[in-house]
Amino acid sequence: MGDDALTADSGRDETQSLSPFRYFTAAEWGRLRQDTPLPLSQGELEELKGFGERISLDEVSEIYLPLSRLLNLYVGETQELYRVTSDFLGREQDKVPYIIGVAGSVAVGKSTTARILRTLLARWPNHPKVDLITTDGFLYPNKVLEERGLMQRKGFPESFDIKRLLRFLSDVKAGSRHVEAPVYSHFTYDILPGETIPVDYPDILVVEGLNVLQPWKPADGDEPQPFVSDFFDFSIYLDADEASIRRWYIERFLSLRRTSFKDPAAYFHRYSKLTEEEAVETADAIWTSINLANLRKNILPTRQRADLILRKGDDHRIRDVLLRKL
């Protein structure tokens, strides 16, 4: 090994010693799966992938299988803590779900990550019950957003019914046997009235959303509120360069323009009539005025609050893993 390589390794070791995170390349992280088998087929992966998402079974095996192994260990230790606490108190304690938060920008792949984790965690030998909800369901309905002049701020913190989300998480953490989360439709771009997702006393709940790691500021006159992340036992941030996320967003917009936007009932049907050039300009304008602004102001600043950062390269593949030191 040459002097340059030694210097590079020394610099990396020094940086790691000062950072609150332990750094792994994808290959280093992948070795932590040990002999854990991959309980997922190619067909199942296709069903879990988000629209236009690029992910292979190799990446699932290298990144998500070791992560599911780590989380399974964490969940087991938490359940053991409840057992010994029950022994100490001399009475049975209610099981409390282990909550995992998944945060990151629009178009970075949060939904796919959340679905893969839910599936892998549910297939461990102890067969835990794993539920998944997205915070999109806690957006205010379009009617409310229009009344408040917030339609162009959709996805920003003020567009969410944060009190309802906090009540939901509080009920889950209190061990409520049945809790319901509202449902959001990307097709109609609105909350679906009367539709809910049941959360029935799971072992693990995965919560996916843009701003789930953000400290929420109470409105004037309101009492201080807990943060959404206060209810998390573990949190994950999906990271990538702005230029890459912008390109992925535009690519997804163009794909939707050729598919679901063509349905006359789709909220964004009008975009299906755009030329390719007009569609790129429109997607770029939406990205810059809404999604990039939200990323820079509200989402990216929360990255350091995560327990795990998954950093993607330009090809959408996870290249680096940063795990918070205990």
Curated annotation (Swiss-Prot):
GO biological process, one term: coenzyme A biosynthetic process
Residues reported to bind ATP: G104, S105, V106, A107, V108, G109, K110, S111
Enzymatic reactions: (R)-pantothenate + ATP = (R)-4'-phosphopantothenate + ADP + H(+)
Entry's localization field: Cytoplasm
Keywords recorded for this protein, A-Z: ATP-binding, Coenzyme A biosynthesis, Cytoplasm, Kinase, Nucleotide-binding, Transferase
CDD domains for this protein: PanK
Superkingdom field: Bacteria
InterPro entries on file: P-loop_NTPase, PanK, PRK/URK
Pathway the protein contributes to: Cofactor biosynthesis; coenzyme A biosynthesis; CoA from (R)-pantothenate: step 1/5
Enzyme Commission numbers on file: 2.7.1.33
Cellular compartments per GO CC: cytoplasm
GO molecular function: ATP binding; pantothenate kinase activity
Record SUPFAM superfamilies: P-loop containing nucleoside triphosphate hydrolases
Family recorded in the similarity comment: Belongs to the prokaryotic pantothenate kinase family.
Classification via PANTHER family: URIDINE KINASE (PTHR10285)
Name of this protein: Pantothenate kinase
Gene source species: Parvibaculum lavamentivorans (strain DS-1 / DSM 13023 / NCIMB 13966)
Phylogenetic placement of the source organism: Bacteria, Pseudomonadati, Pseudomonadota, Alphaproteobacteria, Hyphomicrobiales
